[in-house]
């Protein structure tokens, strides 16, 4: 297998460290994030990074037990880039000075102007005199370390960009990874170019390497995969099937909370198109029976999660002889499990939510996507030939329509919701807006309203349309549909879906709201 050059990101606790990794992956550079306390001299020797980045973080170098880089990192002889706290800790360790933030803190947009000296890492910068950047710091560097020069300043950060070109050490006080620093990606591009990365991290290469790893790990043993119909588990299943063929059996649990025609689409694609061994477990009666009378959203989630584990175990036992369980774990899940704070692993938020299953069933894990971000999973899906209509689908929550139907769930409500949602998504696609929107759906509200249709009075449900734009789902804003679009959509839903006589549009951002209603 190809040995990729590797870049190490040492995490000092920034909320946006994952964005650094995503920017580098977009440049076809393989990188890993590791919390500072796990990076020892022995780790550095084994990892053998071609370059190192120090992330930002909330700490102060003056605090007792402040996060510090590992001994020996400055002696590796590789380029190092320090960001925000990473700059401060670099200066602190190499002989510069840092001052507490008394009246010089910067949070938000700032403008950096260049000095007379130019630096190769800043190629493409300052073509129009100054550059917008995003600052988020209290303390600041007051004296640079020996060997460093100043290459950019801002009103409250006189050492906004510093560097020691001889040692290829660079440090900036701002965050180049966020989109509020428009030329931040260019800075990362320059850094990896100066470090000599080949840019050979592609999904084509990953596909070949992952297949080889799966075959080596599994041998001639059997694997079961909880298939949800979501992108992650589907890409994992197709990749594993390409590696080991019919040694893989997928278990698709239909809990009766899927969208219109979704179960049939999943079965058709995986059983008929990909010819995978597939157990289609229609357990909708079990799930809907258990949810009868339940209105609390947390109770809904826990009930669905508990039943899924029971049902999955029952049907997986039918496979017989399986020794591996496949999961669509992604790199953000792995990062969180070894987080900066040292906190416990988070539950993997997948549709099938199989947390605890490997231990209960005595199975070993196969996680072929654990090195990838979501956008890379989609790219791998395209590489594997999954249809674009499937790869580009909006996120869908694990509990399904249960959390888009506030209050008690009934079969009647679910059917109304499915049909309204199908009309809404069809409208969005007809107008060519689907790919502009992060997520769109209908929520069926637990209220009935009076209406007039023809010459008669109606007393039917109200629904809310939801559509948001987002980069990662952490924050979101409502999509600015035209009034004509909303009017046309409301008319179609009321005319085509029996049981709804009023349509509203939810214009709440996240925060303060969440994307889903429950």
UniProtKB/Swiss-Prot annotation:
Active site feature: 84, 175, 177
Domain Glutamine amidotransferase type-1 as annotated: residue spans: 6-200
Protein keywords: ATP-binding, Glutamine amidotransferase, GMP biosynthesis, Ligase, Nucleotide-binding, Purine biosynthesis
Binding locations of ATP: 228-234
Pathway: Purine metabolism; GMP biosynthesis; GMP from XMP (L-Gln route): step 1/1
Any GO MF annotation of the entry: GMP synthase activity
Protein name: GMP synthase [glutamine-hydrolyzing]
Organism per entry: Cereibacter sphaeroides (strain KD131 / KCTC 12085)
Taxonomic lineage of the native organism: Bacteria, Pseudomonadati, Pseudomonadota, Alphaproteobacteria, Rhodobacterales
Designated gene of the protein: guaA
């Amino acid at each position: 297998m190809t040995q990729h050059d590797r870049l190490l990101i040492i995490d000092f606790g920034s909320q946006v460290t994952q964005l650094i990794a995503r920017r580098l992956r977009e440049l076809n550079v393989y990188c890993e994030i590791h919390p500072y306390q796990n990076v020892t001299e022995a780790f550095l020797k084994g990892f053998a990074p071609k370059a190192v980045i120090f992330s930002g973080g909330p700490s102060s170098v003056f605090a007792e037990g402040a996060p510090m880089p590992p001994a020996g990192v400055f002696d590796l002889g590789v380029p190092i880039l320090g960001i925000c706290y990473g700059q401060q800790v670099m200066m602190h360790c190499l002989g510069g000075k840092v001052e507490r933030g008394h009246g010089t803190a910067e949070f938000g947009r700032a403008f950096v102007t260049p000095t007379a000296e130019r630096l190769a890492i800043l190629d493409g910068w300052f073509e129009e005199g100054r550059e917008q950047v995003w600052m988020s710091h209290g303390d600041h560097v007051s004296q640079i370390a020996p060997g460093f020069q100043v290459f950019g300043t801002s009103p409250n950060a006189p050492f906004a960009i510093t560097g020691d070109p001889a040692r290829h050490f660079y440090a900036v006080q701002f965050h180049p990874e966020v989109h509020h620093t428009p030329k931040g990606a260019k800075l990362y591009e320059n850094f990896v170019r100066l470090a000599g990365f080949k840019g050979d991290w592609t999904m084509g290469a990953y596909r070949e390497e992952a297949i080889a790893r799966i075959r080596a790990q599994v041998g001639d043993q059997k694997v079961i995969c909880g298939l949800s119909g979501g992108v992650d588990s589907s890409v994992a299943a197709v990749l594993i099937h390409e590696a080991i063929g019919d040694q893989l059996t997928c278990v698709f649990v239909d809990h009766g909370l899927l969208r219109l025609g979704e179960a049939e689409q999943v079965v058709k694609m995986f059983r008929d198109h990909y010819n995978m061994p597939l157990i289609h477990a229609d357990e909708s009666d079990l799930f809907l029976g258990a949810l009868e009378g339940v209105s609390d959203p947390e109770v809904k989630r826990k009930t669905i999660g508990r039943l899924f584990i029971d049902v999955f175990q029952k049907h997986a036992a039918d496979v017989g002889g399986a020794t591996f369980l496949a999961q669509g774990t992604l790199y953000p899940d792995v990062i969180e499990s070894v987080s900066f704070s040292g906190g416990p692993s988070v539950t993997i938020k997948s549709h099938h939510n199989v947390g605890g299953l490997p231990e209960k069933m005595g199975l070993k894990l196969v996680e072929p996507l654990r090195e990838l971000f979501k956008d890379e999973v989609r790219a791998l899906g395209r590489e594997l030939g999954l249809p674009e209509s499937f790869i580009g689908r909006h996120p869908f929550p694990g509990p399904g329509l249960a959390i888009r139907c506030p209050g008690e769930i009934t079969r009647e409500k679910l059917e109304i919701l499915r049909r309204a949602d199908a009309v809404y998504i069809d409208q969005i696609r007809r107008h060519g807006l689907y790919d502009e929107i992060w997520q769109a759906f209908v929520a069926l509200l637990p209220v009935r309203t009076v209406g007039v249709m023809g010459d008669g009075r109606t007393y039917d449900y109200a629904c809310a349309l939801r559509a948001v734009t987002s980069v990662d789902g952490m924050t979101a804003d409502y999509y600015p549909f035209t009034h004509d679009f909303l009017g046309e959509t409301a008319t179609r839903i009321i005319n085509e879906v029996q049981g709804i006589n009023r349509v509203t549009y939810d214009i709440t951002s996240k925060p303060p709201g969440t994307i889903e209603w429950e």
